[in-house]
Amino acid sequence: MSDLKAAALRALKLMDLTTLNDNDTDEAVIALCKNAKTAVGNTAAVCIYPRFVPIAKKTLREQGTPDVRIATVTNFPHGNDDIAIAVAETKAAVAYGADEVDVVFPYRALIAGNETVGFELVKQCKEACGDILLKVIIETGELKEEALIKKTSQICIEAGANFIKTSTGKVPVNATPEYARMMLEVIRDMGVAKTVGFKPAGGVRTAEDAQAYLAMADDILGGDWADNMHYRFGASSLLTNLLNTLEVTAETADPSAY
């Protein structure tokens, strides 16, 4: 197997296969769940809006892939600074049966100089999650500056985040290798590689992209770090490219381009 094929297979099993469109339907989510099961293995998770968690759970169970985890989003996509709403949404996501919650950090408040609200929001959402995995989206493309990206990553980790995630996929600039490096360096420098993972999201579209991101993680945190409890790709169109690289066809084409 070529290096690119090996990276493609590795990336496929680390994917949070995503649909977060305003016009999503039960049918779209069922199709997404079907795509999570491939001839070469399953994606790590599907990522969907909270209201679709029950239909996703039913579909994954019926197709014999209950090990595919269900991630959902809260405080999404704007990252508002109302802690009570973010916590209520997170509690609702848990009640729906989500295995993982991706919450948006109140990044605009941080840009304006308020570090406290973000820490409290993440801390209380993690308390609402209990053992459920909490990924925190910091919206790197809006923070832009290295100092802000590193500070936000640090706040999230100190507040109890299980993962730090680059982006919502809903702003002009989403995951970039430069931003990924900054966030991985925070995980390394804080000594939390055992307990904190990383998720680039939005803009990872090809096997070559995924290979470069994984090589960076291997370089910074070691070759055995990026397993599915420490690394995820938030993507949709990536899956088709990975399957093409592996010379496998998907059951249904995914028209989204997250």
Curated annotation (Swiss-Prot):
Protein keywords:
Cytoplasm, Lyase, Schiff base
Q: Which Gene3D superfamilies match?
A: Aldolase class I
Per the record, the pathway is:
Carbohydrate degradation; 2-deoxy-D-ribose 1-phosphate degradation; D-glyceraldehyde 3-phosphate and acetaldehyde from 2-deoxy-alpha-D-ribose 1-phosphate: step 2/2
Instruction: Cite a GO CC annotation.
Output: cytoplasm
Enzyme Commission number? 4.1.2.4
Q: What class of enzyme is it?
A: lyase
Any Pfam family: DeoC
Question: Which GO BP terms, alphabetically?
Answer: 2-deoxyribose 1-phosphate catabolic process; carbohydrate catabolic process; deoxyribonucleotide catabolic process
Annotated active site residues, numbered on this chain, are D102 (proton donor/acceptor), K165 (schiff-base intermediate with acetaldehyde), K199 (proton donor/acceptor)
The catalytic activity, as recorded, is: 2-deoxy-D-ribose 5-phosphate = D-glyceraldehyde 3-phosphate + acetaldehyde
Source domain of life is: Bacteria
Major site of localization recorded for this protein: cytoplasm
Molecular function GO terms recorded: deoxyribose-phosphate aldolase activity
Q: Localized where? A: Cytoplasm
Q: Which HAMAP family match?
A: DeoC_type2
Biological function: Catalyzes a reversible aldol reaction between acetaldehyde and D-glyceraldehyde 3-phosphate to generate 2-deoxy-D-ribose 5-phosphate.
Indicate the family of this protein: Belongs to the DeoC/FbaB aldolase family. DeoC type 2 subfamily.
Q: What is this protein called?
A: Deoxyribose-phosphate aldolase
Q: Which organism is it from?
A: Aliivibrio salmonicida (strain LFI1238)
